[in-house]
UniProtKB/Swiss-Prot annotation:
InterPro entries: PLAC_motif_containing (IPR006461)
Subcellular location, principal: membrane
Superkingdom, natural source: Eukaryota
One GO cellular component, as annotated: membrane
Transmembrane domains' residue ranges: 57-79
Name of the protein this chain belongs to: Protein PLANT CADMIUM RESISTANCE 3
Function: May be involved in heavy metals transport.
Pfam families registered for this protein in UniProt: PLAC8
Keyword Transmembrane found: yes
Subcellular localization: Membrane
Organism: Arabidopsis thaliana (Mouse-ear cress)
Length: 152
């Protein structure tokens, strides 16, 4: 399953879909990240690593590294580079590290929004997004289909 490639929503090459300080454009994720950044990081890592690193494993490693070194950004900045490489977004490793070191929460929420903008349902993880795409019968992952809430 991890070897499958999902094609997401197209976006202008070379740029992030949202600004670095646009944390409040997704208030729910902003609050979750502020309270427990390991959750957002785990969700990002699961998608970026295409299911090879689970949300729980990545989140636990993030917490462990943050507890030991006081700097979870040592781990999370690597994923910013992976996102840039996957989507041809301009930047470099030094800037990635600085952004995570200076404002970890802004960096994590921007990465979360980027993946969400590209069509991933962050709550499903990689495997859930693959399954969702297969159930829709598509080859490439486009914009997520609207699924209504509970009805009576």
């Amino acid at each position: 399953m991890a070897s499958q490639h999902l094609q997401a929503n197209p976006h202008a090459e070379g740029e992030w879909s949202t600004g670095f300080c646009d944390c409040f454009s997704d208030c729910q994720n902003c609050c979750i990240t502020w309270l427990c950044p390991c959750i957002t990081f785990g969700q990002v890592a699961d998608i970026v690593d295409r299911g090879n690193t689970s949300c729980g494993t990545a989140g636990a490693l993030y917490v462990l590294l943050a507890a030991i070194t006081g700097c979870g950004c040592l781990y999370s900045c690597i994923y910013r580079g992976k996102i840039r490489a996957q989507y041809n977004i301009r930047g470099d490793g030094c800037t990635d590290c600085l952004k995570h070191f200076c404002c970890e929460l802004c960096a994590l929420t921007q990465e979360y929004r980027e993946l969400k903008h590209r069509g991933f349902d962050m709550s499903l993880g990689w495997a859930g997004n693959v399954e969702k795409q297969q159930n829709q019968g598509g080859v490439a992952m486009g914009a997520p289909a609207f699924q209504g809430g509970m009805s009576r």
